[in-house]
């Protein structure tokens, strides 16, 4: 009948953020879900992996000129447990926990927001665009959360291992840093942090996107087992470690209590090379490798599973 209204498929929306996409079109994740799922994943992950983060930071701060206090990873753990008990490996956890939740929330929220704009009409995101979205997510988390929180964390851990600690707790430490150094005291090493986080997430999301696309093949909505997601995450984490550990070392030095020794990020890199040699740029790689692989695997597994639950209870049509 000529007067009948023309039927328009409710699925004819290439970029709709729905829980049920048409066959052959990838489901997109609403940024709001990504923020919530990312925050949950970040909080759980850091509680599990913090001891390796503590050891990594201690080894990086243990400069050769001191002379070195620790002989290696095992010695660092041994001395810490002997002096402070097992709980000593969790000193500084509060500062990192307060930052981990919003960091992961910003990272995944920004990544999903950017990727939803850059996917093709079938909803697929190629690995190159995944790298760009990851870079954007990394820069955002660096500026909004990571730099101020990491600066406080490094100063707090460094202070707690000194002969006469002056910070009574996380919030007291923050107040003292702001009181004596101003807000800029929480933004030391911003350039190094942006470079580190940007390259970190660019590498991780590039690898994850490439592996996911390979695994799913021609079916963009093919379900991925959590174990597989974890393996992909571990590979992505390892790639990021070897790709930017030097930046991580520079960032840690720039945010430590002796950051005043360096005029800039470049000056820090030059002095490390001049006085400690190229090997110093990879100091703490082993503990960082273990932590990051576990970190990324856990975060992606929890994130993906939480998103699945949210898709059932939070409709975003």
Swiss-Prot record:
Keyword check for Cell membrane: no
Solcar repeats: 29-117, 128-214, 224-309
Entry keywords, A to Z: Antiport, Membrane, Mitochondrion, Mitochondrion inner membrane, Repeat, Transit peptide, Transmembrane, Transmembrane helix, Transport
One protein family per Pfam: Mito_carr
A molecular function (GO) term: tricarboxylic acid transmembrane transporter activity
Predominant location: mitochondrion
Lineage: superkingdom: Eukaryota
Biological process (GO), any one: neuromuscular junction development
PTM text: Possesses a short cleavable presequence, which, however, is found to be dispensable both for targeting to mitochondria and insertion into the inner membrane. However, the presequence is required to keep SLC25A1 in a soluble state and thus in an import-competent state. Mature SLC25A1 lacking the presequence is prone to aggregation.
PANTHER family in UniProt: SI:DKEY-178E17.1-RELATED, SUCCINATE/FUMARATE MITOCHONDRIAL TRANSPORTER-RELATED
Family note: Belongs to the mitochondrial carrier (TC 2.A.29) family.
UniProt protein name: Tricarboxylate transport protein B, mitochondrial
Organism this protein belongs to: Danio rerio (Zebrafish)
Record lineage: Eukaryota, Metazoa, Chordata, Craniata, Vertebrata
Encoding gene, per UniProt annotation: slc25a1b
